[in-house]
Amino acid sequence: MTEPVDGDTPSDDDRRRLAPPLPAGWRWGFPIFLVVALVWAGVLLVDGLSTVLDSEGGETREAVTDPSAPGFEAFVEQTWSMLVATEDGDGELVQVAVVAATDRAGGGGTILLVPPEVMAQGCEASPCRLVERHREGGIDHVRETVTRLLEVEVTAAVLMTPDRWTSLAGPASPVPVDLPIDLVATASDGTSVVRFPAGRVDVAPSDVVDLLAFPDGADGLGRLERQSAWWAAWLVRVGIGDPLENLPNLELDLVDLMALVAGGSVRLADLPWTAVETDLVSQLVADNGMVAELAVQMFPFPIPLVPGQRPTVRLLNGTGDPSLDSPARERVLRAGVDLAVVGNYRHDGVIQTRVVYRDLALAGAANDLAAALGGGTLFDEKASPVTDLTVIIGADFWSAG
């Protein structure tokens, strides 16, 4: 290699030969250091985000999974329910039952029988009864009428025909039913035939709808009593042993719901109907007060009839006494709000029941709910935004009732 003289520029090859080689530690250590730094930055980012998401007021909080522990909260699992409408062979509405599972874990529930003769609204002609609503709009109009009466939506509605009842009731049949009188039918030629004799009758699957549909007086209360007797006897038979063994092997929500309800304590409700005499005819009307109270008991966590119409509520027990959960929930529902979250306050020992709101526009709703519960109100801009209102049950809950 020749030495450059002043003014000469070294060639590229000369410059490369002049640059000293990097030490082995730098050649391998720097890339490794860079990879480690990037990985560690990712770990710190994930850890930081987790800390922020799990923190409140500058303190790290662990998720509470024990339903009995302070701080536990959960979105409600809305009550599983179904409207079951039955048509006879001519397509006429003969029975409506609202089935609600009170406890998804332990089984049991309530069945409300609604007579087709009950007065309704929205018909094109008069008189307007549930049976007329069915004639005009089928099961959709029946569902609309009954849910409006209850002020609660149902999970689903199903239409039952004679063949479908034969299939559903078959595995647990015949069902013994006690009848106080002979049920006499008139044949097409005018002769009378005893269709179901007085006393204990074993109702075959193919005769279920004939019994449920057998005509009665104008108000339909006699037929409602027979329907109640059949439902009670059938549910007893379904509930023996494994309920699913006493129902058809079909993947239907109705089958699963009936198995769940029959597997626990069952309540049959057929009382909130009153026969009112008018100048022309006897009319069957609903006792709105009884229906409203029954709806609170049937639907522990109801589906809102019109979502967003009522304030949503987060209900927290601040007493540490779980026996107050159910009465507090019922009191809140009677106040006309939608229950969305239930749980426990972050600590026990709360003295005063109060309704917390974060939006001044909800002050009126908070005051109304507080008055219904006998508690106070508190405005807190930092209250949970999950619901419109937060109810914290305190030790004064019973004295406020």
What are these regions (language model features)?
Residues 2-401:
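Non-catalytic, solvent-exposed segments at the cell envelope interface
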